[in-house]
């Protein structure tokens, strides 16, 4: 057991999907995994291990924001030996070419957080995805016929930002979307020498306000990213 995860050693696979919403973790376990067993209910942050196409895979919620995902990802890596971590979550489009329900693979993550500067005050350390996972996910998504964008995202510490126009401006610099977790996940992956990737479904748009989705849709219908994430985890 770790501080926030109740699993025993051996109950968590070395490859895992990380949705922010614990109910999305439950949905993935019930709809994609065979023989799924719940290994964590602490703080209702559900985690499950099962098989996908014969491969042992886990899925666990992380909550919202970089502090929350940092807790769970670090414990999964350090205490349970997880080697491949793929975030599957939602994001808001910052780019007029990126639309609701399309996928974004975060090649890198800019951030307004001090999560890196706390360790490296003299550097702007780049938070980047594992190229191996990114390459596999891109080709899998293309083979499945999914509209997929690859590029930078903004990982924000603030959901209700007072710098809305500044965020929009980033879209003009090629930033695809804004979310709240990828930079922290990538930083931990670099620190502990594991592979990480963030796959997001666009749930709303900051540049096209008429494009949005319901809370139920966000929880239960964004299955493309789940398929891509699982296929990427088991790809050789």
Swiss-Prot record:
Catalysed reactions, semicolon-separated: a purine D-ribonucleoside + phosphate = a purine nucleobase + alpha-D-ribose 1-phosphate; a purine 2'-deoxy-D-ribonucleoside + phosphate = a purine nucleobase + 2-deoxy-alpha-D-ribose 1-phosphate
Species, as recorded: Streptococcus pneumoniae (strain Hungary19A-6)
GO cellular component, one term: cytosol
GO molecular function: purine-nucleoside phosphorylase activity
Amino-acid positions noted as binding a purine D-ribonucleoside in the UniProt annotation, renumbered to this chain: 4, 179-181, 203-204
One Pfam entry name: PNP_UDP_1
Oligomeric and partner information: Homohexamer; trimer of homodimers.
Top EC group: transferase
Keywords attached to this entry: Glycosyltransferase, Transferase
Family, per entry: Belongs to the PNP/UDP phosphorylase family.
The enzyme's E.C. designation: 2.4.2.1
SUPFAM superfamilies membership: Purine and uridine phosphorylases
A Gene Ontology BP annotation from the UniProt entry: purine nucleoside catabolic process
Site feature Important for catalytic activity, where: 218
Protein name: Purine nucleoside phosphorylase DeoD-type
PROSITE patterns (UniProt xref): PNP_UDP_1
Glycosyltransferase as UniProt keyword: yes
Catalytic residue positions: 204 (proton donor)
Binding site for phosphate: 20, 24, 43, 87-90
Function: Catalyzes the reversible phosphorolytic breakdown of the N-glycosidic bond in the beta-(deoxy)ribonucleoside molecules, with the formation of the corresponding free purine bases and pentose-1-phosphate.
